[in-house]
Curated annotation (Swiss-Prot):
Pfam families (UniProt xref): FKBP_C (PF00254), Trigger_C (PF05698), Trigger_N (PF05697)
PPIase FKBP-type domain segment(s): 160-245
Record flagged with keyword Transcription: no
Protein name, as recorded: Trigger factor
Gene: tig
Organism: Acinetobacter baumannii (strain SDF)
SUPFAM superfamilies reported in the protein's UniProt record: FKBP-like, Triger factor/SurA peptide-binding domain-like, Trigger factor ribosome-binding domain
Amino acid sequence: MQVTTEAVSGVARRLNVSVPTSRINEQFEARLKRTAKTVKINGFRPGKVPANVVRREYGASIYQEVVNDIIRDSVFEAIQQEKINAVGTPNIEKVEHKEDALVFEATVEVYPEVEVKAFDGLEVERKTAEIKDADVDTMIENLQKQRQTWAVTKGMAKKDMQVTFDFEGSIDGEKFEGGSAEDFKLVLGSGRMIPGFEDGIIGMKAGEEKVIDVTFPEDYQAENLAGKAAQFKITVKQVEKPKLPEIDAEFLKIFGVSEEEGIEKLKADVRKNMEREVRNGLRNQVKQAAFDALVAANEIEVPAAMVAQEIDRQRQQMVQQFTQQFGGAGAQSFDKSMLPDELFKEQAERSVKLGVLVSKVLADAKLEVDQARVDAYIDDMASSYEDPTEVIEYFKNDAQQRAQIEAVVLEDQVVDHILASAKVTDKAVSYEDLLKEQQARRMG
């Protein structure tokens, strides 16, 4: 077998393969003999069919099978012979039967060979944050709000109060579907309703009626209402103000704090959890910033096969998330057309490029996972659970789960390696702003 290789692009090679006709003939004759032993043809006993009859009846199909098998086998032999780091399935082209050889072309994508630029040209912003006493107080107040009750008031409705009311909407004097409800409960300031709706209720008291004018947003989900002016008749039935629970023994017990330990122990526990959250948030932020800089500084071409595989992985991940949220029945209604490739392509390309670059950084720097950092990562994560020892043992005994942690830690080591040479600018942010950034990153 003869093979020549030419570069089609940075991530594709064209193989010109020539297979001797003698190889095809040998396999063809061998397969004819095997077929003759098992084939059933009227007028002949099994295994006694003459070779010329088998050749006449089955020769063409057997020959094509042999050719297909030889092309399949020889293309992979050629890839190994040429030491090509192939990805995806080869594309066979221009098959030609010559007198002395079967000649064909095969195009195959290859794993990118890249050189990573020096890190001293990278600019990375690294956020810093610290937990202040006011942040802890706000968090404890949020814990109280999660368990708040409502107390009826005769006063005017204000922001953060809960109002029970009836409403009836109309456009140009005509009622519309979904525009009416009775005993509807709404916390003012929650942003659940269209702009202007909640503002129109502020200041009303129980027993009062009012007509408010609002306009549906241009991008409202119901197209028949989008951008239209509407009137809503509001009848307030009840106004309630929030009542936070006292920080007493019963409240402290919810969080595993005794009355003797008191509010200071609760604050200490809350601060500890917030500090862990900040550490994780800052680590993820600087990792994102470093990797963004790495990808931006190194324009590389990646194989379409790798991108397609990553698109499928991300699509499957989204379906799994949907299943967890809405149950298996909802996921079964999904089909590929609902989640087209274009939805994932940009992120998939970035992910593949980043993976190639990180692998190269690991190889160049000869980085290996730091098991001490893996243990520290697991310890920190386990400390948020009721029984940390059980969590630590779980990761100790489950190699697959530990491998996932090792992958995260190894990424952290790559980030540290990049930051050691990059131009790093520290920027202090508040705890609240850090949380907002994390939420925005998760949502998009």
